[in-house]
């Protein structure tokens, strides 16, 4: 019995000493923000993703009573829209996704071997998206969180910035877009 306990203890200790090296590795076989932006193709793919329809919200026609009859009711016509409303939360998160992706392109969008005119075009598209997204956020929500490169720790405690400050930054981004785009 003592011999079995020794083998059992040795086996448990052996198994407990094995572990994975680092479980926080990005999948090396797939693209991620850590291993992307090496060449022109990857940067263009990242920019093309900024033009997905989710990032350009269109208001529904049934939100207005000018075209449809006034007998129907919905959250907008009743004035009961809250942050829990599906459209509201989806737009908020989609616009911030586009901001994060545009910022990532600005931070990493100048890989070696790309002409200056192409880099400027990439910067222009990313700045346009930043400006557009912040304009949309202020149109829908007024004050919103302004991310000018905050760290993750800062993001956890970030508060909304005044609408006029966000719009000033959005217009600054749109001016840069006009400067960089051909």
Model-derived segments and spans:
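Proline-centered turn/helix-capping motifs that create local helix->coil transitions or kinks
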Residues: 21, 58-61, 137-146
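Short alpha-helical hairpin
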Residues: 61-81
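Bacterial Sec-dependent N-terminal signal peptides
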Residues: 1-29
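Conserved, well-structured interaction surfaces
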Residues: 44, 75-141, 155-168, 172-182
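Short, compositionally biased low-complexity segments
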Residues: 18-27, 73-75, 142-145
């Amino acid at each position: 019995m003592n011999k079995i306990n020794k083998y059992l203890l040795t086996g448990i200790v052996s198994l407990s000493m094995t572990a994975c090296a680092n479980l926080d590795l990005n999948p090396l076989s797939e693209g991620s923000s850590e291993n992307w932006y090496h060449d022109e193709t990857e940067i263009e793919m990242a920019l093309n993703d900024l033009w997905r329809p989710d990032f350009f919200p269109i208001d529904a026609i049934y939100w207005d009573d000018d075209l449809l009859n006034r007998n129907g009711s919905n959250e907008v016509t009743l004035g009961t829209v809250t942050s829990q409303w599906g459209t509201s939360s989806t737009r908020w998160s989609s616009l911030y996704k586009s901001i994060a992706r545009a910022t990532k392109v600005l931070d990493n969008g100048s890989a070696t071997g790309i002409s200056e005119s192409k880099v400027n075009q990439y910067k222009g598209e990313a700045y346009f998206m930043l400006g557009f997204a912040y304009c949309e956020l202020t149109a829908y929500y007024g004050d919103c969180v302004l991310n000018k490169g905050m760290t993750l720790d800062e993001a956890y405690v970030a508060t909304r910035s005044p609408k006029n400050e966000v719009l000033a930054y959005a217009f600054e981004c749109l001016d840069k877009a006009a400067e960089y785009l051909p």
